[in-house]
């Protein structure tokens, strides 16, 4: 696992990377108190998350998954068991163990940190992005130089187009983009950069985008048959 620490004035912002699934996890705190939240944790790294939190003297109060992941088992439930944090997902989530379901445009608060939920279906029908000041956590909806596949978990290329072009790409151009995955060593981007340079976004219509996405012919994620039911039921790997 790799992790990167950014201190923005008082704010604590850590980006951790799971090399097996190429998943980014984010640990965030305002720094003005001791409360923290985590976005998109991977179960294998639960001990590392706890270690980071303890080293920074932070208390985990909320943990968020942007959607039901198909390429890894979430650490959301293990973190809940070990810290009693609140498990958060969008209201469309199929998860059976969520403590707090967030509606589109609803806000999540952890001390002085505020995230606004944006319903961004397409990769899955339960995908949400989260806007925090100058940055947006896009899950698998908008990637760096790519977009999330739309061929499983009730995904829809047409819905993805609407989420991208009518929601995310309408954010201010200098908004930082932090996705749930990257496969080329990139840590973040901006809305302007993705709008101008992302090859998946250089289309002239919803139909053209759907034509591209519906003909990718990708293999299913290796962990899909394990990860999806585990993430819906709230299971840990040792319970499968």
Show where each model-derived region lies.
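Accessory terminal helices/loops
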Residues: 162-176, 180-238
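Active-site HxH/HxHxD metal-binding segment of metal-dependent hydrolases
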Residues: 22, 33-35, 43-119, 196-200
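Active-site metal-binding loops of divalent metal-dependent hydrolases
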Residues: 41, 68, 92-93, 123-124, ...
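Ser/Thr-glycine-rich phosphate-binding loops at phosphate-binding pockets of nucleotides
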Residues: 61-67, 120, 138-139, 180, ...
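Gly/lys/ser-thr-rich phosphate-binding loops in alpha/beta enzymes
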Residues: 88-90, 95, 107-109, 142, ...
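Core dinuclear metal-dependent hydrolase active-site scaffold
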Residues: 27, 107-132, 170
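Short, Lys/Arg-enriched N-terminal segments with co-localized hydrophobic residues
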Residues: 1-10
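Conserved beta-strand hairpin/beta-sheet module of binuclear metal-dependent hydrolase folds
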Residues: 10-59, 129-139, 145
């Amino acid at each position: 696992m790799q992790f990167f620490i950014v201190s923005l004035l008082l704010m604590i912002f850590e980006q951790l990377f799971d090399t097996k699934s190429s998943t980014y996890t984010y640990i965030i705190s305002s720094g003005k108190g001791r409360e923290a939240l985590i976005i998109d944790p991977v179960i294998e790294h639960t001990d590392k998350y706890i270690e980071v939190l303890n080293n920074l003297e932070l208390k985990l109060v909320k943990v968020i998954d942007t959607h039901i992941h198909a390429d890894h088992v979430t650490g959301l439930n293990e973190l809940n068991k070990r810290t009693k944090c609140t498990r958060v997902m969008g209201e469309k989530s199929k998860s059976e163990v969520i403590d707090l379901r967030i509606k589109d445009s609803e806000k999540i608060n952890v001390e002085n940190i505020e995230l606004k939920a944006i319903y961004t279906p397409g990769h899955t029908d339960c995908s949400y992005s989260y806007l925090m000041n100058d940055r947006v956590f896009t899950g698998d909806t908008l990637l760096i130089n790519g977009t999330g596949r739309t061929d499983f978990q009730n995904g829809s290329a047409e819905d993805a187009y609407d989420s991208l072009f009518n929601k995310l790409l309408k954010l201010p151009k200098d908004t930082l983009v932090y996705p749930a995955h990257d496969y080329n060593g990139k840590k973040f981007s901006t809305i302007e950069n993705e709008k101008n340079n992302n090859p998946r976004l250089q289309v002239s219509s919803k139909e053209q985008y759907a034509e591209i996405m519906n003909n990718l012919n990708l293999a299913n994620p290796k962990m899909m048959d394990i990860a999806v039911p585990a993430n819906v039921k709230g299971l840990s790997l040792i319970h499968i």
